[in-house]
Design a protein with these regions (language model features):
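Hydrophobic alpha-helical transmembrane segments of membrane transport/permease proteins
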Residues: 20-77, 171, 176-198
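Residue-level signal for discrete positions within transmembrane alpha-helices
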Residues: 16, 110, 114, 150-153, ...
């Protein structure tokens, strides 16, 4: 089985690299074919200077930038020149957001903020959704189960942007119950503040963004957990376990839950990339300096090197989630036969 899993993993890695290459090629082609000139977008915000200085030097800078970004070459040549740099660990330099700065450095600066948000959101999602899904599954079609189902569908239907804005309007400064900070992720440290006070203020800054990132995943996972548990709980081996006199908690948690984990693992593969995608809106609304805000700046300024690096990161994260799910399958159920999948 180990040999079969190794072969399967190797095959998935090769397929993942090919998929990532196609994602990057498609993204580059779309950006190059989009209307407008990215070099002109990147020059917005530069000082206009005197009118005397100008048209020739502006045109010279524009031509120089086009050459640097390989925009003076055919699309396929431009992509392969960029990809050649990536293979040597060079993702290029930002053309607009932070001119001349390596995009890898920009991403590494913003990544810890987004990671902290997303890790907290994943923990909240799984720690809250799985118990609720199990609780609902062992009480099927009761009033409480129906109320939980209605609540979960209601949560799942809420748009992230609207929810974030409504939470700000109600719970932030100027709202009905101004408990949480309006923006940012870190408090303003006043001299004399204790460590506990700083920690408490930091947690308050995290509450609304983490809720916005996790509520949809929480609702979906709770429903998937309920469905998976209901499917397993009526199997013959569960009836046998009950007939042996095992306690209900042992039957549910030790036997039913373990077999229902496959469904939850499948959902995990999609949670990582969806959280990063949701970070774009959440970080924008709450003015959080993470990967989401960086993506918005890169899109609005058409910073091609930075956008390509972000696409590479997002694509790699999606494929890593799928690969991690495959590994978790083996841990959850060693009976899975990978030989047949090769």
């Amino acid at each position: 089985m180990k040999e079969g899993f190794t072969k399967y993993l190797f095959k998935r890695l090769l397929l993942g690299m090919l998929t990532l290459f196609i994602i990057l090629l498609s993204s580059y082609i779309l950006m190059r074919l989009a209307p407008g000139d990215p070099t002109k977008s990147s020059m917005l915000g530069e000082g206009a200077g005197t009118q005397l200085s100008s048209e020739k030097s502006a045109l010279a800078r524009n031509d120089s930038l086009r050459e640097k970004l390989h925009l003076d070459k055919p699309v396929y040549v431009g992509f392969f020149l960029w990809f050649k740099g990536v293979l040597h660990g060079d993702f290029g330099e930002s053309a607009a957001v932070d001119k001349g700065r390596p995009v890898a450095s920009l991403i590494l600066e913003k990544l810890p903020v987004t990671l902290s948000l997303n890790i907290l959101a994943i923990l909240v999602t799984y720690l809250c959704a799985i118990p609720l899904g199990i609780f609902s599954a062992v009480r099927p079609d009761t009033r409480l189960d129906n109320a939980i189902t209605f609540f979960l569908f209601f949560l799942y239907s809420l748009p992230v942007l609207w929810t974030a804005l409504m939470l700000q309007a109600v719970f932030c400064k100027g709202g009905w119950l101004p408990v949480f900070p309006l923006k940012g992720l870190f408090p303003e440290i006043v001299p004399g503040m204790s460590t506990w006070a700083i920690l408490g203020q930091t947690l308050l800054h995290y509450v609304l963004p983490v809720f916005c990132l996790s509520y949809a995943g929480f609702a979906g996972l709770a429903r998937f957990t309920r469905s998976g548990m209901l499917e397993v709980i009526h199997q013959d081996y569960i009836r046998t376990a009950r007939a042996k006199g095992l306690s209900e908690s042992s039957v549910v948690l030790k036997h039913a839950f373990r077999n229902a984990m496959i469904i939850m693992i499948t959902l995990f593969a999609g949670i990582l990339p969806s959280l990063v995608g949701g970070s774009i809106l959440v970080e924008y609304v709450f003015n959080i300096p993470g990967m989401g805000s960086l993506s918005m700046l890169a899109l609005s300024s058409r910073d091609i090197p930075l956008l390509m690096a972000l696409f590479a990161f997002g694509g790699a994260l999606t494929l890593a989630g799928i690969l991690l799910a495959d590994i978790l399958y083996v841990i959850a159920d060693p009976r899975i036969d990978f030989e047949s999948r090769i």
